[in-house]
């Protein structure tokens, strides 16, 4: 019989948790940002709002987004006219789509991550699923185990309604799980859809135009584990050295999301870029002082691309060279703001770009890097990463 002491002393991992694989997925429906204002006002029967459309066109032009992917399409919107009225009772329809599509979109990303990992899925010991899109019992984590055929004893964590900072949250939790048990392999999946927040424009609620111009659909999957099994050709892409979360001072209400019968209504205060950029220096100092690093151009950057203004003001405030945020800007341009998904896309883009350009490491040839998640609260997740040689 095992003693309590022997159970307590179950072997932990020897090393740091590492990102062992990354997968990503997007829906097939693509809309160019330049064409989106015409599409948006046409499908919502709002073309009579001429001045509002001109304002929306200006907003879209400033986003630095080239295209976005969506689960929904024009046929769906036509069949559900409740989406063509601002805050019409539509929660049931939104829920049905999210509950159906989020697990499937997440499974596509997870399948790619497992292929990238190159190990049998039976080695997955934990699952973290994160979405701000719809809620159900059992949740999207359960649905994913059924789609992928994961072991029934996989230990699951379901995160709902976290928002844009959660790409960092999932890595923080995965690090704790991976390092707490020798041999643990954590599958992290984030999946988001704008089905929960798409709605017609309103002259009385013009703040929502920014939401309609920014957000998009996608899914990411990351496999995290410590002590890569070199004999099985398991290889790390990034080492997760440390993680932290903080609520920024004087930021209550700056970013939020409120669910009602009309769906999820996001609030994005115009001061968000200023609040984030004002505080990012302190986050950097607290994270990197233990490692003797204070030159922010000497590390690689993976901030959440919540919007062009956030990236611009962080770059200016910290004194970054323009190329330091190129990966996050690329993700924003090609996919829009996919909430929790974005930073995982950026990590994948960085390692692939580094390899293609012949860099010495997965982090643009640099050793140390930072990943930031920004979201409701205003909450900041800070993840210190270490690249690996290529």
From Swiss-Prot:
GO annotation terms (biological process): flavonoid biosynthetic process; polyketide biosynthetic process
Family matches, as Pfam families: Chal_sti_synt_C (PF02797), Chal_sti_synt_N (PF00195)
SUPFAM superfamilies: Thiolase-like (SSF53901)
Transferase as UniProt keyword: yes
Keyword check for Magnesium: no
Catalytic machinery residues: 164
CDD domains registered for this protein in UniProt: CHS_like
Keywords, ordered alphabetically: Acyltransferase, Flavonoid biosynthesis, Transferase
Gene3D superfamilies for this protein: 3.40.47.10
Reaction it catalyzes: 3-(3-hydroxyphenyl)-propanoyl-CoA + 3 malonyl-CoA + 3 H(+) = 3,3',5-trihydroxybibenzyl + 4 CO2 + 4 CoA
GO MF annotation list: acyltransferase activity, transferring groups other than amino-acyl groups
Domain of life where this protein originates: Eukaryota
EC nos: 2.3.1.-
Entry similarity comment: Belongs to the thiolase-like superfamily. Chalcone/stilbene synthases family.
Name of the featured protein: Bibenzyl synthase
Organism of provenance: Phalaenopsis sp. (Moth orchid)
